[in-house]
């Protein structure tokens, strides 16, 4: 085998490895293709409870033209100013043009549990999908049932304002680093939570309520330091108290 042929084989192998890794990282995650959003009253009622318990209104409340807010409407627009840019909470009413009116069950599962849009792009972690990763599918679908039962509101929110280097593609590396350095909140079930009551509390605090998104410190890349879960944090000029 001549040297040129050997180099080509090595190059071909390296390209194949890179493509395989890219496929693994960028391909939208698999979810239950048989899942459906229910329209019955019980599912909607459970979804309403979950949306309230999860504090969704805190970010997704409507922002009126005069700057006032309306927590009774989830049409979004609230600006979250962070060290990584300004992020605007989206419209989560069932408006087809500016909201989630055309979302299917699989879209809710990929968004909440994997941080991926219906088109497959990555959501910025201002949306706490790493906490929501631990939600069970039934709860996610009930949340979808409730949101799709709301009155649609046409409200196009502003585009996120991020530095030039922070693209959605960069989130591939960010998510990988977060997995390697801290894991996901859904994996933090300890021996202290053996009782069903404590397991339920952990589920509400770590996952649905995503308390750690504010109360757990982060490193310079914005990755939660889960070894210090609920130990308090500094967000901008605000000091978030410890709740551990």
Question: Which residue ranges define each predicted feature?
Answer:
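N-terminal Sec-pathway targeting helices
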Residues: 1-16
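Membrane-interface motif at the C-terminal end of an N-terminal transmembrane signal
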Residues: 17-34
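C-terminal capping alpha-helices of c-type cytochrome domains
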Residues: 22-24, 104-118, 131-157
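Electrostatic cytochrome c docking/interface patches
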Residues: 30-52, 66, 176-206
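The canonical Cys-X-X-Cys-His
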Residues: 47, 53-63, 108, 143, ...
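Extracytoplasmic
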Residues: 51-54, 87-89, 122-124, 138, ...
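Electron-transfer interface patches adjacent to heme c in soluble/periplasmic c-type cytochromes
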Residues: 77-107, 130-140, 228-244
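Extended, well-folded interaction surfaces typified by the phenylalanyl-tRNA synthetase beta subunit core
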Residues: 155-172
């Amino acid at each position: 085998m001549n040297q040129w042929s050997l180099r080509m084989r090595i190059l071909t192998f390296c390209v194949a490895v890179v493509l395989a890794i890219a496929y693994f990282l960028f391909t939208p995650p698999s979810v239950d293709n048989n899942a459906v959003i229910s329209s019955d009253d019980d599912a909607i009622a459970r979804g309403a409870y979950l949306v309230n318990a999860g504090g969704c209104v805190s970010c997704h409340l409507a922002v009126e033209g005069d700057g006032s807010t309306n927590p009774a409407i989830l049409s979004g627009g609230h600006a979250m100013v962070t060290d990584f840019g300004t992020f605007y909470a989206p419209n989560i009413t069932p408006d087809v043009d500016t909201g989630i009116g055309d979302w299917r069950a699989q879209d809710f599962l990929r968004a909440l549990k994997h941080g991926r849009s219906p088109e497959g792009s990555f959501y910025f972690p201002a949306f706490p999908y790493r906490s929501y990763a631990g939600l069970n599918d039934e709860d996610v679908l009930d949340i979808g049932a409730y949101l799709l039962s709301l009155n649609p509101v046409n409200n196009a929110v502003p585009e996120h304002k991020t530095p030039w280097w922070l693209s959605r593609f960069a989130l591939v590396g960010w998510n990988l680093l977060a997995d390697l350095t801290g894991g996901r909140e859904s994996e933090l079930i300890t021996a202290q939570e053996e009782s069903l009551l404590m397991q339920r509390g952990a589920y509400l605090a770590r996952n649905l309520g995503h308390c750690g998104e504010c109360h757990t410190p982060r490193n310079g890349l914005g990755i939660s330091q889960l070894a210090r879960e609920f130990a308090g944090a500094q967000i901008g000029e605000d000091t978030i108290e410890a709740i551990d």
